[in-house]
Curated annotation (Swiss-Prot):
This is UPF0349 protein BCAH820_5046. InterPro entries: DUF1450 (IPR009910), UPF0349 (IPR022916). It holds the Pfam family DUF1450. Transmembrane segments: none annotated. It comes from the Bacteria. Belongs to the UPF0349 family. It comes from Bacillus cereus (strain AH820).
Amino acid sequence: MIKPLIEFCVGNLASGSQAALEKLEKDPNLDVMEYGCLGYCGICFEGPFALVNGEVVQGSTVEELVNNVYEYLDENPMF
């Protein structure tokens, strides 16, 4: 079974999205990855974000980011 891919930039983790990564890693239905740089420096500077199946998902807080990731997945099923 292919799982949704959630990607985080290490620079954004240092800026506060580490808690979102840790929460999402607990979900066995997600593949959560961490990379050195995803090339979204402007977005990274603005606040917490992740790539969800290749699409940028943002939040003004860690909690909002996690909620927005799940909302994106609900609205954009893989199959």
